[in-house]
Amino acid sequence: MAEFVEADNAEAIIARIETKSRKIESLLKQYKHVEALKTALEGSPPKTRDERCKSANWIVVHRALMAIKDIDGMLNALDVEYYDILMKYLYRGLSTGDRPTCDQCLKIHEKLTERAGLGCILRCLTDTINTV
């Protein structure tokens, strides 16, 4: 069974996310959108059940996702190791029902699926332990 982060560690996780958020804002201001997305995806708290942590990290990832204009360029620059976690966040974005977010997530989903294949989708949907 996977180890889950206890609620008392949630404050430490949120503090790390806040630090990460400031770094992402700086990268976005420098038009380093891919670096911002990588930073947002790194250290995502998938093993916590604390919704505050998940929501805080989603906000950071969402900000970076919405800044991406060149999806092919982003995927060329993004390491393969990021594909599965990115797919999870795309589904989280689609679940919001927000039109601009869904549009962006669908565009990225299409290109990511072309690049990573259906296995990426299957791993994302069947992994019920590491959730975003």
Swiss-Prot record:
GO molecular function, one term: actin binding
Record's keyword terms, sorted: Acetylation, Actin-binding, Cell projection, Cytoplasm, Cytoskeleton
InterPro entries hit by this protein: ARPC5, ARPC5_sf
Main location group: cytoplasm
Keyword Acetylation: yes
Gene3D superfamilies: Actin-related protein 2/3 complex subunit 5
Tissue spec. comment: Expressed at low levels in all tissues with a relatively highest expression in inflorescences.
Keyword Methyltransferase recorded: no
Positions bearing N-acetylalanine: 2
Effect of deleting the gene: Distorted trichomes and altered epidermal cell types.
Location in or out of the cell: Cytoplasm, Cytoskeleton; Cell projection
GO cellular component, as recorded: Arp2/3 protein complex; cell projection; cytoplasm
Any GO BP annotation: regulation of actin filament polymerization
SUPFAM superfamilies: Arp2/3 complex 16 kDa subunit ARPC5
Subunit field text: Component of the Arp2/3 complex composed of ARP2, ARP3, ARPC1/p41-ARC, ARPC2/p34-ARC, ARPC3/p21-ARC, ARPC4/p20-ARC and ARPC5/p16-ARC.
Family the UniProt entry places it in: Belongs to the ARPC5 family.
Primary role: Functions as a component of the Arp2/3 complex which is involved in regulation of actin polymerization and together with an activating nucleation-promoting factor (NPF) mediates the formation of branched actin networks. Arp2/3 complex plays a critical role in the control of cell morphogenesis via the modulation of cell polarity development.
UniProt name for this protein: Actin-related protein 2/3 complex subunit 5A
Native source species: Arabidopsis thaliana (Mouse-ear cress)
Upper lineage: Eukaryota, Viridiplantae, Streptophyta, Embryophyta, Tracheophyta
